[in-house]
Amino acid sequence: MGVTIEKLIKDFSLEVIQTGEENVPINVSDVNRPGLQLAGFYNYFAPERIQVIGKAEWSFLEDMSPDLRKKRLNKFFSFDISCLIITRGLEIHEELLKAARKRNLWILRSDMVTTKFISKITMYLSDKMAPETRLHGVLVDVYGIGMLITGESGIGKSETALELIKRGHRLVTDDAVDIKEIDGDLIGRSPEITFGMLEVRGMGIIDVSALYGLSSILNSKQIKIIIHFEHWKDDGDYDRLGVNDEYQDILGVKVKKLRVPIRPGRNIAVIIEAAAANYRYQRMSDISPVDIIEKRMLESMEKESKI
C-alpha cells in the first residue's frame, strides 16, 4: 500500500515550501540523494524515489554559477519526481524553486540531520508498504521469542496465553494477528481496536495491562515459531523425536511449525515455554538432543562389546 505526500508531511511534520499535485502516491521505500544527477550523470537514476538534498548536495549547488545551477536543476526536474525534501533546515535556492514551480512539484523541508532523516523515512516507508495479511491466532512473547499460537476456535489458545502472561510473558495480540513482511522478517501486531485485550470464554474480554501491568503487553513482535493446537488423536502420527521439521509459508517466509496435541491434563503453557527455550538452544548449538542420545548409544554399545 502506497503513501501520499500529504500523509508524509503530516507524519514527519515537514515544512511545505512548494505545493504540488494532490494525492501523489509514493510507491517505493527507497530514497535517493541526487548528487550524481546534479553533476549531470543520469544513468540508473530512479526518479520514482523520494529525492533528498542534504548538506553535501546543497553545497555542490551553492558552488555552481547561477546559470549552471539553473541548467542542472531544470534537467533534474524534467524527470517524473514525486517530491524533493531539503534536510537540516537549509535555505532553498531560488533556481530550485522556480524549476519546481514550473513542474508543479512538491518541495519540502526538514530540520533533521540528513542521515537520520533518511534512516527514519526508509523504515517508515518499508513498514507502510510491506506485504500484509491477517491470521486467526494469538501472538505472545515467550523468553524473547515471538510465538504464534494457532488452532480452531475454542481449543484453548487464549486460555494458554493467559497462563503465559501470569508466568511473566507478554501478549502482543489475541484473536486477530496483523502480519507484515519486512526485509524477510514477519512482524505481528494487534489491530488497534483490540490492542491489549484478551478474550477468555466464560469471562469475556479482559484488559491485560490493567490486570497485569503495562509490562505484560507488546506493540509488535517478530514471529519465530508457530504453535498449532489440534485435538488429541490416539492414532495421531506425532513427532516424538523432534527430527521432522515442518514449516508454514506466510507472505513468502517459511516459519517453523510445531503441532501440539491438546487433551486434558497437559500443561500447554509449560510446553510452549520449553519450545521457546529449545528454539534458543537450537540457534546456539549444533548438537541436538537426538545427536546426544545417539552418541550415548554408540558409547554404550562400544563398552558392551569390550566386555
Curated annotation (Swiss-Prot):
Which GO annotations describe the biological process of this protein?
regulation of carbohydrate metabolic process
Q: What keywords sit in the KW lines? A: ATP-binding, Carbohydrate metabolism, Kinase, Magnesium, Metal-binding, Multifunctional enzyme, Nucleotide-binding, Serine/threonine-protein kinase, Transferase
State its Enzyme Commission number(s). Answer: 2.7.11.-, 2.7.4.-
Question: Which reaction(s) does its UniProt entry say it catalyses?
Answer: [HPr protein]-L-serine + ATP = [HPr protein]-O-phospho-L-serine + ADP + H(+); [HPr protein]-O-phospho-L-serine + phosphate + H(+) = [HPr protein]-L-serine + diphosphate
What GO molecular function annotation could you give as one example from this UniProt entry? Answer: magnesium ion binding
Q: Would the keyword Chaperone be found if you checked this record's keyword annotation?
A: no
- Binding residues for Mg(2+): S158, E199
List cofactor names only: Mg(2+)
Q: Region entry Important for the catalytic mechanism of both phosphorylation and dephosphorylation: which residue ranges?
A: 198-207
Q: Report the active site residues.
A: H136, K157, D175, R240
Q: Which InterPro entries match?
A: HPr(Ser)_kin/Pase (IPR003755), Hpr_kin/Pase_C (IPR011104), Hpr_kin/Pase_Hpr_N (IPR011126), P-loop_NTPase (IPR027417), Ser_kin/Pase_Hpr-like_N_sf (IPR028979)
Record-annotated residues binding ATP?
G151, E152, S153, G154, I155, G156, K157, S158
Does this entry carry the keyword Ubl conjugation? no
Region: Important for the catalytic mechanism of dephosphorylation; residue ranges are 261-266
Family named by the database record: Belongs to the HPrK/P family.
> What is recorded about the protein's domains?
The Walker A ATP-binding motif also binds Pi and PPi.
Could you give the subunit structure recorded for this chain? Homohexamer.
Function, in words:
Catalyzes the ATP- as well as the pyrophosphate-dependent phosphorylation of a specific serine residue in HPr, a phosphocarrier protein of the phosphoenolpyruvate-dependent sugar phosphotransferase system (PTS). HprK/P also catalyzes the pyrophosphate-producing, inorganic phosphate-dependent dephosphorylation (phosphorolysis) of seryl-phosphorylated HPr (P-Ser-HPr).
The record makes one more remark, namely:
Both phosphorylation and phosphorolysis are carried out by the same active site and suggest a common mechanism for both reactions.
UniProt-recorded name of the protein: HPr kinase/phosphorylase
